[in-house]
Amino acid sequence: MRDPRTIPIPISTAPRRPESTRLGEARQAVAGRTVAVVSGKGGVGKTSLAVNLALALAENGARVLLVDGDFALGSVDVLCGLAPHRNVSAYLDGACPLAGTLAVGPRGIAVLPSASGRSDLSELDSPTRTRLLEDLGTLSRRFDWTVVDLPSGIGSTGMALARWAEIPLLLTTPDPAALLHAYATAKLLAARGRTPRLVVNRVRTEAEGAEVARRFARTASFHLGAAPELWGTLPEDPAAQRAAADQDPFVVAAPRAPVSVRVRELAHRLGTDEHPQGSAHAGGDRKDLFLPVPAA
């Protein structure tokens, strides 16, 4: 377990020049890019992917902010081995600015922890949600990457964060229930003009992941008019379970494990993506972020 105190992070408030950060052999785009990891169903490995993806992005010196977007009952701090002194509830209650809640995680990433057991934070009201997204947009521009772990399901706060992000990553497993819930999530995102990238977790073979993605894309194309592109498959790997039990992310604890290799490949692909979808804080005004979520 790491130092339980929240460690102040020196973050300059001066405007930053666009810069490049090496990610493997790739050149990363302008600083301030954002990724939201979303799933329709709990238990598919979403938080684990968010944590390990953030650490993979930080491997070569990129400045990374990891946000626990499940404000009422998140677990990012647990998977990072942290016991933070503050969490997002201090900001939402008006006790400190958003940057004042940050803690230092593995590899020096900044972690914005969630509250634990605050049911009143499970769904934020519209003014609070607007303030949060504005402040998060300002904070994210001080980092090369912001990775947001969203709550499972299709609540208004989680969907607003998914639409806010430049790159929504939709995680599922081959389980039929997980696929059904992932499709419902893709449908809600499509209603706001967003097509997520698809990642299939816990596959036995790469061919299984490709087949899951093919069937998902066929259904989405027919009903939604747009198909999520497959951006990666993650194998069922005992290293992931052992690392979670030890509160030690698998890209750190088992860097050569197959699942760690695949997550680093996903990080590399994110760094070389030349066609981001754009977002509210990095591509113009998006008033639709604050509209009610349409019915599934």
Where are these regions (language model features)?
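NTP-binding/hydrolysis catalytic cores, primarily Walker-type P-loop NTPases
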Residues: Q247-A296
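Inter-motif core of Ras-like GTPase G domains
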Residues: T138-R141, G155-P176
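Beta-strand-loop-alpha "switch" segments that mediate conformational coupling across diverse proteins
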Residues: L224-V251, V263
